[in-house]
């Protein structure tokens, strides 16, 4: 194996922002934007974009499709293991770098991959029929450091494996990207309108007045009955908590990229993303990190506990204080923290798993959340894929104990979750990884936009309050769709 294999990294100057540049490539196949749209001093420091992958890996059940240019190959096996093997040849050594992602795989793992991590029933309807995972592998990415206000091109030269050829290709790809950036700075006046960021005044001026119907996969009565059924399972000792969700669908009357611009304007989030993949376009504004790996350090940040934002400062303060001091919400958060500690303990060194933040209040444009942070150090020989298999899917969106909670989810939710509550993010050539929990996210397929919202049910839960909480979590998504003042919610 070649040692000391590094990428080429060059700082560049551009007059356009990351969202504006992505607007110029958003309609290209396999274009992506991993967008940190919040305070750059904390979680919103870096954004990444790119297109033209040299390798695409997607899976349906145990059938894995591998695309290299015009060549298509089908393999069979566990998708997690196959993805790990396919990425293994493309490795970079760790080196000092200005950004954490130096090229690699970008894409999604759907919740339905849980059938490869646990033995579970599968009775819910798979009506969206999307691949259960899809990762595109990029040799060149454009990175933004929002704190330092710098931009970088990272070029790796893959899939070339011979070192001289790899570096030659890396230099060529770097120069191509610089030429593209120069061209955009010259012609941005032609391309910029509608490509980048959207302010509140522009958002309001574009507000549509027509009525749009949201269709749920639950009737309100069915959702209430399902909440109470979960409470019965809890009373019987089956579980402590179950995350129950409902999915909405609406006809999409704007482009997916326009929807992304609107969602970014109304709900900037630290773990947002846009994936323009052939079978689905994903627009995410997730506030939650599932797993971050940097060298051997692992971090997960489960979110559990929600209140809507108030209409004024006094109401805002009251709701924030109510959430902070809610025994129910803190108990939910603690249950999930214990679950995540156990999951990390399966692959981390003994004594390294620690809770560094417990149920701290975080403020978002439409809601308050309670968030905790759990960290650990991976055991020698454990890969990021091993970690993913041990912890997937995230405990904050299943319940506890995890396996029984997932069995109940399959029983009570009428349709498969697909990408919802799975993960979006990157797996780097240097084996670093950062992936979110897919919440506050649109799945766009064949002219329809789907989004799913839910909450953690415990014995003390009030069914009607839980139903309302799902609507609170949908506020930013509904506003991004720019629905009419009269929003009609219809049952399935």
Task: Please place each PLM-identified region on the residue numbering.
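Extended alpha-helical targeting/anchoring segments
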Residues: 1-492
């Amino acid at each position: 194996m070649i040692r000391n294999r590094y990428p080429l990294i060059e700082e560049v100057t551009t007059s356009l922002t990351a969202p504006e540049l992505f607007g110029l490539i958003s309609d290209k196949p396999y274009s992506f934007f991993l967008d940190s749209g919040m305070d750059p001093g904390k979680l919103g420091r870096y954004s990444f974009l790119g297109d033209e992958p040299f390798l695409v890996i997607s899976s349906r059940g145990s059938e894995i499709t591998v695309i290299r240019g015009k060549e298509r190959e089908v393999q069979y096996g566990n998708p997690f293991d196959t993805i790990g093997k396919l990425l293994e040849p493309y490795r970079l050594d760790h080196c000092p770098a200005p950004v954490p992602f130096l090229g690699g795989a970008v894409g999604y793992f759907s919740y339905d991959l849980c059938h490869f991590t646990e033995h579970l029933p599968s009775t819910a309807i798979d009506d969206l029929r999307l691949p259960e995972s899809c990762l595109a592998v990029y040799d060149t990415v454009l990175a933004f450091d929002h704190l330092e206000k710098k931009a970088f091109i990272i070029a790796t030269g893959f899939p070339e494996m011979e070192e001289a050829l790899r570096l030659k290709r890396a230099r060529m790809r770097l120069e191509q990207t610089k030429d593209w950036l120069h061209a955009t700075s010259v012609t941005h006046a032609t391309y910029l309108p509608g490509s980048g960021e959207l302010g509140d005044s522009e958002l309001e001026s574009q507000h549509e007045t027509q009525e749009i119907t949201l269709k749920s996969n639950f009737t309100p009565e069915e959702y209430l009955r399902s909440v109470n059924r979960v409470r019965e399972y809890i009373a019987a000792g089956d579980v402590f908590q179950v995350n129950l969700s409902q999915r909405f669908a609406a006809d999409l009357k704007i482009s997916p990229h326009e929807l992304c611009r609107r969602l970014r304007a109304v709900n900037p989030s630290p773990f947002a993303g846009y994936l323009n993949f052939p079978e689905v376009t994903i627009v995410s504004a997730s506030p939650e990190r599932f797993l971050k790996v940097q060298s051997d350090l692992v971090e997960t940040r489960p979110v559990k506990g929600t209140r809507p934002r108030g209409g004024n400062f006094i109401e805002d303060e009251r709701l924030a204080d109510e959430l902070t001091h809610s025994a129910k919400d803190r108990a939910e958060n603690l249950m999930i923290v214990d679950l995540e500690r156990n999951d990390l303990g399966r692959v981390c060194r003994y004594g390294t798993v620690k809770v560094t933040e417990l149920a701290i209040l975080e403020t978002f444009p439409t809601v308050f959340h309670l968030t905790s942070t759990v960290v650990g150090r991976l055991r020698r020989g454990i890969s990021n894929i091993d970690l993913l298999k041990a912890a997937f899917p995230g405990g904050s969106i299943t319940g506890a104990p995890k396996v029984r909670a997932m069995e109940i989810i399959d029983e009570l939710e009428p349709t498969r979750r697909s990408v919802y509550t799975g993960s979006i993010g990157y797996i780097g050539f240097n084996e670093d990884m950062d992936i979110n929990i897919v919440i506050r996210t649109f799945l766009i397929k064949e002219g329809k936009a789907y989004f799913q919202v839910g909450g953690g049910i415990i014995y003390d839960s009030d069914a009607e309050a839980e139903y309302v909480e799902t609507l609170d979590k949908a506020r930013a998504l509904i506003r991004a769709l720019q629905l009419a003042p009269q929003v009609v919610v219809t049952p399935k």
